[in-house]
Amino acid sequence: SWLLAMVGFRYNIDQLFLPVVAISGIGIAFINPDRKIYHWLKFFFSLSFLFVSLSYIKSGMEGWVSHTDLGFFSRYPSIVFVLLGASLTGVVQSSSATMALTLSALHSGGISLYMAMGIILGSEIGTTLKLFIASANGLASKKRVALANFLINLVTTLVVWIILTPVYRLVNQWFGDQQELFALVFFQTLVNLVSLSLFLPF
């Protein structure tokens, strides 16, 4: 998330990474998987594809926001955005994808930082769905792990949601209106630190 905020929205990087995607993709297709360079090619392919995808998401979001009035969303309470984040992450099965979409919407001016924080907070719950799916036909131990992960994320989300308004004011004061992308990524890091502080002693 920090890498996306620092690089993905500051520079037009799709033209740089498109050739990397092509070259590394060809290498993956023809090089023996047992060779060390194969794994490096997979790494560069995945990283480059991430930034190319982000570029298309960003341009698509900017076009959508320019033709859509999202002002009415500001009237909704924070719980709506928490539920939206949980639902979106449950559908796409990736909190990273939710973060990329939310950063794009925030960068385009479609949503406020407060709305974005609610969406990212909700993604903590939505990301647990894939563990439930993976453990559906598995051992009882896998189901317990999935349930424990859900409860940890649920408690963390509830705790942070209760104090979301003062946390928003504090984060917004630290970063200001010009650094909202970094403020959102910092908030996600803060949520993870809260989770650690709540459950690490146990």
What are these regions (language model features)?
Residues W40-L84, A105:
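Helix-loop-helix hairpins and the membrane-proximal interhelical loops
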Residues E124, T128-L129, F150-V159, V185-P201:
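Hydrophobic transmembrane alpha-helical segments of multi-pass transport and channel proteins
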Residues S1, V21, F43-L47, F51, ...:
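Alpha-helical transmembrane segments of multi-pass membrane proteins, especially transporters
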